[in-house]
Amino acid sequence: MTDFSPREIVSELDRFIVGQADAKRAVAIALRNRWRRLQLEGSLREEVLPKNILMIGPTGVGKTEIARRLAKLAGAPFLKVEATKFTEVGYVGRDVEQIIRDLVEVAIAQVREKKRKDVQARAQVAAEERVLDALVGPGSGPATRDSFRKKLRAGELNDKEIEIETQAGSGSPMFEIPGMPGAQIGAVSLGDIFGKMGGRTKKRRLTVADSHEILVNEEADKLLDTDQLVQEAIAAVENNGIVFLDEIDKICVRDGRSGGEVSREGVQRDLLPLIEGTTVSTKHGAVKTEHILFIASGAFHIAKPSDLLPELQGRLPIRVELNALSRDDMRRILTEPEASLIKQYVALMKTEGVTLDFSDDAIDALADVAVAVNSTVENIGARRLQTVMERVLDEISFVAPDRHGETFQVDADYVKTNVGDLAKNTDLSRFIL
């Protein structure tokens, strides 16, 4: 779990996301509160529940991007899911408890990766012995093995092909158990039922270099205590887990609609106990959800937050509104983030030996076109910039391999030549931009 202060979290998010200070502050405080709770003792720690967040804002303003960046910062089990993928329990499709099962799998992978590093040195030695067995045979003498070991460490044998036995992947047949709700639970792997079948292995031919990582990971896993690893992962989910529920506005039931709504109101009802706190059964054990932080987000351009079930609204107490992007925001998005669009295109063209040079007026023109099309066609926020950039650089991208060593100057006139008329013609821009 990260111990960044809210100010540090916000400044980290600022490196990649323009504006939306309120949303950044809300998630930064929520993340810091996770750390604060863990510093408390005994019963008080159990009483402090996370303050779940509802982010409201038009499409393309940074809601999902905030979640992506937060996942990397959190250092905690983090899962992003779309609310539209779930159906009410008892119907075909995934039920919401699958969210927690997936979160446990994420946590197990995280803990395993961390623990592998602790046994890395011993695993390297064991993996080296397995490579030597494949090269010179298990019964070879010490002198031969030492000679090959020196060559192996010097990298002289990297391209040599060897045959090794590796653990068979999770390719066990899957089948449905009738009557079990939700396709994801119903599909059970034979490997899960009968264990690992005595550790099935398969032979593979690989180069020495390619086999290294596979063998090191296998040897590291042999040194790990799986039961302890799973317990740690479940504890991490229960205390630090974060779930980002995207597109929550799409499961609102709007006035005048009637019918079963198994993937709308039914899903909202199923989410209630999950967010409030319940115990979910997974194949690794029971998981309590009281202290998992839920961050929900939606555009709410047709439905309103008040269209959510009142009980669900109450379980998302912190509301954050994200603003639509202005022309100035568009301009900043093109230039300021560490991996801004312009930096990406310059780097891509550099691989062809072509230099792209954007003038300031070109950046203004790109922002103007994006804002103009957003206002006349459909406002899709910053995503419009990608469409405009692709259109502007279409010709350069196509001819770049034949123009090695050349410099292309992109200015306002170049932008207008390529997209200016399209932006003005609303009927055309509906289909092209």
UniProtKB/Swiss-Prot annotation:
Lineage, top ranks: Bacteria, Pseudomonadati, Pseudomonadota, Alphaproteobacteria, Hyphomicrobiales
Binding of ATP, residues: 18, 60-65, 246, 311, 383
Q: Which GO terms describe its cellular component?
A: HslUV protease complex
* InterPro entries with a match to the protein in the record: AAA+_ATPase, ATP-dep_Clp_protease_ClpX, ATPase_AAA_core, Clp_ATPase_C, HslU, P-loop_NTPase
Listed GO biological process terms: protein unfolding; proteolysis involved in protein catabolic process
- What is its subcellular localisation? Cytoplasm
Would you indicate the residue range of the signal peptide? none
What would be one Pfam family of this protein? ClpB_D2-small
| Record-level Gene Ontology MF annotations | ATP binding; ATP hydrolysis activity; peptidase activity; proteasome-activating activity
Q: Which UniProt keywords apply?
A: ATP-binding, Chaperone, Cytoplasm, Nucleotide-binding, Stress response
Homology family? Belongs to the ClpX chaperone family. HslU subfamily.
Q: Which SUPFAM superfamilies match?
A: P-loop containing nucleoside triphosphate hydrolases
**UniProt entry tagged with the keyword Chaperone:** yes
What name goes with this protein?
ATP-dependent protease ATPase subunit HslU
Q: Has UniProt tagged this entry with the keyword Nucleotide-binding? A: yes
Q: What does this protein do?
A: ATPase subunit of a proteasome-like degradation complex; this subunit has chaperone activity. The binding of ATP and its subsequent hydrolysis by HslU are essential for unfolding of protein substrates subsequently hydrolyzed by HslV. HslU recognizes the N-terminal part of its protein substrates and unfolds these before they are guided to HslV for hydrolysis.
Q: What is its main location?
A: cytoplasm
What does the subunit comment say? A double ring-shaped homohexamer of HslV is capped on each side by a ring-shaped HslU homohexamer. The assembly of the HslU/HslV complex is dependent on binding of ATP.
